[in-house]
């Protein structure tokens, strides 16, 4: 399986969501933003494309965000986000195409009232991925808490977004590892990995979207098209692992 990684520092926090509540600052639950430093309720593909990023690959101008996590009522700032762009569960990875500029996607369900599918949301302690669960672990003894969210990898080929922000995308794992006729364009499988420095009992965790079950994340593609295309060619289509460059020192 091919993959290329991008490490991104936390950028900012705000009660904004340019996908679900565009043009309405303060209308959303609080989110933590990574990547593009300008992301806000008024963001557009054009406004994102010309701005700086907190990511280690400077031509990744995409916006990434997830709901704020609270521990015993206190906001916890995630100390790192790693984006993993993978070939994903596809019978024929050679058909993968770049994301169209301006594509918006959501992974997970912010209104969930029970654990979500492990293939979409996945909690673990540090890097014990296979031992993680779709619900929060009881405790992380001496290691950080991690949340991974997996985005859909089949696009309808027409719409950069949809009314419910989900119908234009679907998961190949739901269709026998193929992209269905309704969503024929295979794109990279994006997995966002968030790390929180919470060590100890996790029974007082909640997300800004509601309960602990509502883990979700949003993505707005503003990659430089040629940079994304080259990483897909070099890493995904050749089944290679391309690790993230190191993050530059903090200013």
Where are these regions (language model features)?
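Primary mode marks residue(s) on the alpha4-beta5-alpha5 output face of response regulator receiver
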Residues: 1-28, 32-149, 156-251
